[in-house]
Amino acid sequence: GMRIPSAIQLHKASKTLTLRYGEDSYDLPAEFLRVHSPSAEVQGHGNPVLQYGKLNVGLVGVEPAGQYALKLSFDDGHDSGLFTWDYLYELATRKDQLWADYLAELASAGKSRDPDESVVKLML
């Protein structure tokens, strides 16, 4: 069945979404959620579009979308991502691995988490 959290807390100041499943609690940073948003723009119709420069992004809204998902709104204007319960559980339980993968993708693409910084790749 669907893994629905027993509690959901949005901490705007720390830019964190906390999901509780029974005894287990997971803190998901807004940046992590933003770069893993399942929306059409981000997924690019089948080919995921690498999101970068989202270091400072915050969460401004969390609302249920029907019985099956959460709609997350971010302060960069992105609000079309519907995070299903199953996907949220995957993000929560696999956060460390997914984040490491994301950082590796950023590095190989020469992109930065910081929107004010561009990475100069030296071809030595």
Residue ranges and their predicted role:
Residues 1-124:
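Motif-centric detector for short Cys/His coordination patterns
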